C-alpha cells in the first residue's frame, strides 16, 4: 500500500507538471482526489490494516494528498497569472494616443426657449410656480370664471379622466391654486410653465400636448399699462430690440379687458410677407386684466387688488425664434433636427 501511494503521488505530480490548461489540472484533481479516485480507495482499504499500521498509513495518505493539492494550487495560480499576462499583452493601451472626443448632447429647442423665457421674467422679479398636470375641474375652469354651463368651455376640448378630474388645458390652474393658497392675500408675481393637453388633431401648428407658459401679477394699483410694458420687455429680450408689439381686443373668460398680442414680423419687418400673411404682424400670446370674479373666488378684494395675466405656447415662440415650420418636429426625436440646437 505504501508503494502504491508513492506511485500515485509521482504520477499525479508528473501530470500536473505536464498540464498546459486549467481544464487539464481540474481533470487531475478529479482523477486523483475525487470521491472515486485511487487515494480515496486507499483510505477505504485502511480498515484491513492492523492497529499498528493504520496511524502510519493515515499520515502517509494525508501527506500524499496535501502534496498533490499544494502542487495543483501552485500550478493553477501560475496558469491564471499567465492567462492574465497574455491578455494584458494583447490589450496594451498606448497612453500617448489622443483621446476620443466626447459627443456633446443637444439642448432641446423647447427646453432652451422655456429657460430663456424663465430667465427674462425672473430678471423682472417673477418666481416660477409649477403644478400638477392632472387637475380638478374646479381649478381648471370654475375658479377661472368658467362655470359648468359656460359656453366658453367649448373653446377647449378637454381630456376628462373622471367627471371632476381632467388633464389640465392650461397652466392657469396653477395661478388659481397660487391665489387661493396665498393666505395673506398679498401681491403675487409668478410664471407657470408646464405641459397642457387638449383634444386637437395633430398637424403642423396643433398638438394634443404642448408646453404653455402663463404669467400672473396681483397687486394694488395694477394697470393695463403695466401689462403692456411687461410684454414689451419680454418681446425685445426674446426677439430683439427692433421688435414692435400690437395689442388687439379679444375675449377670455378669466380676463377683462382681454387682448391678443402681435409682434412685428421678423421676416419682412412689418412690410407684409407669406409668414405674416401680408399683415406685417404675427400673433404670439393672449393676455388681459384679471377678471374681478377670479380675484373674488380666490379670496381677494377686487376693489383693492388688481392684476394681469398672459399666456403663450413655448412651441409657438420656438417656431418663430428658430424658423421651424412644423410643431411636430419638436416631438419626433429626429437627431438631425435636434443637432441644430447644440449649445456653443
UniProtKB/Swiss-Prot annotation:
Organism: Bacillus cereus (strain ATCC 14579 / DSM 31 / CCUG 7414 / JCM 2152 / NBRC 15305 / NCIMB 9373 / NCTC 2599 / NRRL B-3711)
One GO BP annotation of this record: phenylalanyl-tRNA aminoacylation
Catalytic activities: tRNA(Phe) + L-phenylalanine + ATP = L-phenylalanyl-tRNA(Phe) + AMP + diphosphate + H(+)
Keyword Manganese: no
Keywords on record: Aminoacyl-tRNA synthetase, ATP-binding, Cytoplasm, Ligase, Magnesium, Metal-binding, Nucleotide-binding, Protein biosynthesis
Stated name of the protein: Phenylalanine--tRNA ligase alpha subunit
SUPFAM superfamilies attached to this UniProt entry: Class II aaRS and biotin synthetases, tRNA-binding arm
Localization in the cell: Cytoplasm
Primary location class: cytoplasm
Complex formation: Tetramer of two alpha and two beta subunits.
InterPro entries named in the record: aa-tRNA-synth_II, aa-tRNA-synth_II/BPL/LPL, Phe-tRNA-synth_IIc_asu, Phe-tRNA_ligase_II_N, Phe_tRNA_ligase_alpha1_bac, Phenylalanyl-tRNA_Synthase, tRNA-bd_arm
Entry-linked Pfam families: Phe_tRNA-synt_N, tRNA-synt_2d
PROSITE patterns, sorted: AA_TRNA_LIGASE_II
Molecular function via GO: ATP binding; catalytic activity, acting on a protein; magnesium ion binding; phenylalanine-tRNA ligase activity; transferase activity; tRNA binding
Protein residues bound to Mg(2+): 256
GO cellular component: cytoplasm
Keyword RNA-binding: no
Cofactor entry: Mg(2+)
The enzyme's E.C. designation: 6.1.1.20
Family, per entry: Belongs to the class-II aminoacyl-tRNA synthetase family. Phe-tRNA synthetase alpha subunit type 1 subfamily.
EC class (word): ligase
Cofactor notes: Binds 2 magnesium ions per tetramer.
Amino acid at each position: 500500500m505504501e508503494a502504491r501511494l508513492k506511485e500515485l503521488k509521482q504520477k499525479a505530480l508528473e501530470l500536473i507538471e505536464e498540464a498546459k490548461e486549467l481544464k487539464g489540472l481540474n481533470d487531475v484533481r478529479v482523477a486523483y482526489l475525487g470521491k472515486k479516485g485511487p487515494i480515496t480507495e486507499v483510505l477505504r482499504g485502511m480498515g484491513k490494516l492492523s492497529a499498528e499500521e493504520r496511524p502510519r498509513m493515515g499520515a502517509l495518505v494525508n501527506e500524499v494528498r496535501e502534496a498533490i493539492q499544494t502542487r495543483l494550487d501552485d500550478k493553477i495560480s501560475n496558469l491564471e497569472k499567465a492567462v492574465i499576462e497574455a491578455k494584458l499583452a494583447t490589450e496594451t493601451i498606448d497612453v500617448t494616443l489622443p483621446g476620443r472626443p466626447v459627443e456633446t448632447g443637444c439642448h432641446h429647442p423647447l427646453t432652451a426657449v422655456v429657460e430663456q423665457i424663465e430667465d427674462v421674467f425672473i430678471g423682472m422679479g417673477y418666481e416660477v410656480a409649477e403644478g400638477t398636470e392632472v387637475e380638478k375641474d374646479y381649478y381648471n375652469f370654475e375658479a377661472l370664471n368658467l362655470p359648468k354651463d359656460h359656453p366658453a368651455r367649448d373653446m377647449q376640448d378637454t381630456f376628462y379622466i373622471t367627471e371632476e378630474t381632467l388633464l389640465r388645458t392650461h397652466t392657469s390652474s396653477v395661478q388659481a391654486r397660487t391665489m387661493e393658497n396665498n393666505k395673506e392675500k398679498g401681491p403675487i408675481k409668478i410664471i407657470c410653465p408646464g405641459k397642457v393637453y387638449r383634444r386637437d388633431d395633430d398637424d403642423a401648428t396643433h398638438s394634443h400636448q404642448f408646453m404653455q407658459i402663463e404669467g400672473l401679477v396681483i397687486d394694488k394699483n395694477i394697470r393695463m399699462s403695466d401689462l403692456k410694458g411687461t410684454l414689451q420687455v419680454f418681446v425685445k429680450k426674446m426677439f430683439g430690440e427692433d421688435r414692435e408689439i400690437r395689442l388687439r381686443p379679444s375675449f377670455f373668460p378669466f380676463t377683462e379687458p382681454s387682448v391678443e398680442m402681435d409682434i412685428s414680423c421678423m421676416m419682412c419687418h412689418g412690410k407684409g410677407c407669406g409668414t405674416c400673411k401680408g399683415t406685417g404682424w404675427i400673433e404670439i400670446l393672449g393676455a388681459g386684466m384679471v377678471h374681478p370674479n377670479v380675484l373674488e373666488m380666490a379670496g381677494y378684494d377686487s376693489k383693492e387688488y388688481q392684476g394681469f395675466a398672459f399666456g403663450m405656447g413655448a412651441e409657438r415662440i420656438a417656431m418663430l425664434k428658430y424658423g421651424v415650420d412644423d410643431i411636430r418636429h419638436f416631438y419626433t426625436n429626429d437627431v438631425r433636427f435636434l443637432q441644430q440646437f447644440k449649445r456653443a
